[in-house]
UniProtKB/Swiss-Prot annotation:
Family indicated by similarity: Belongs to the universal ribosomal protein uL3 family.
Native source species: Streptococcus mutans serotype c (strain ATCC 700610 / UA159)
Single GO molecular function: rRNA binding
Gene3D superfamilies for this protein: 3.30.160.810, Translation factors
SUPFAM superfamilies: Translation proteins (SSF50447)
Protein name as catalogued: Large ribosomal subunit protein uL3
Entry keywords, A to Z: Ribonucleoprotein, Ribosomal protein, RNA-binding, rRNA-binding
PROSITE patterns referenced in this protein's UniProt entry, alphabetically: RIBOSOMAL_L3
Described function: One of the primary rRNA binding proteins, it binds directly near the 3'-end of the 23S rRNA, where it nucleates assembly of the 50S subunit.
Domain of life: Bacteria
């Protein structure tokens, strides 16, 4: 059965094991998620559990949103997402970090930091040209391709908007869970800026 929870990225820190090993970790605050809806094949065509995270003021919600969360007897939520392959949950039930334990392998999804409009060197890792005064090529994208097609092929590495993409990092290890603070520590870094939404769920490609 899949485990899943929504949280916010707090930042990175480091911890030491009893043997003195240094481990960089990302701190994710995951206050209790509330089950807003349980979808079934009969009613929705597929099975999933819809959960809400992070309360927001009622004045920021419209009537349909208020009516939807009222069924779960909770406040309007800023983030609403779905998890599949989760069973045994009912509307209004809370999901906490206690379902995870140290050693679990998870997939973490977040939105990467937006970098704005960037050149080919930063965006695609291309090599720059000589920086000498006589050089006529420093940080340009390079050749656009052969003359014959009379066009630039799709996929050519050019300058453009960088970042702000939804990215999933797979097979990260849960180092520690602190239920009293609603905090989970995950080994390494995860995509996203501080305070951004993070989705944690059981790894789909974990070694068995």
């Amino acid at each position: 059965m899949t485990k899943g929870i929504l949280g916010k990225k707090v930042g990175m820190t480091q911890i030491f094991t009893e043997s003195g090993e240094f481990i960089p970790v990302t701190v994710i605050e995951a206050t209790p998620n509330v089950v807003l809806q349980v979808k079934t094949v009969e009613t929705d065509g597929y099975e999933a559990v819809q959960v809400g995270f992070d309360d927001k003021r009622e004045v920021l919600s419209n009537k349909p949103a208020k009516g939807h969360v009222a069924k779960a007897d909770t406040a309007p939520k800023r983030f609403i997402r779905e998890f599949k392959n989760i069973e045994g949950l009912e509307v209004g039930q809370e999901i906490t970090v206690e379902q995870f334990e140290a050693g679990d392998v998870v997939d973490v999804t977040g939105t990467t930091k937006g970098k704005g409009f960037q050149g080919a060197i930063k965006r695609h890792g291309q090599s720059r040209g000589p920086m000498a005064h006589g050089s006529r090529y420093h940080r340009r994208p390079g050749s656009m391709g052969p003359v014959a097609p009379n066009r630039v092929f799709k996929g050519k590495n050019l300058a453009g908007r960088m970042g702000g993409n939804r990215v999933t990092v797979q097979n990260l290890e849960v180092v520690q869970v602190v239920p009293e603070k609603n905090v989970i520590l995950i080994k390494g870094n995860v995509p996203g800026a501080k305070k951004s939404l993070i989705i944690i769920k059981s790894a789909v490609k974990a070694a068995k």
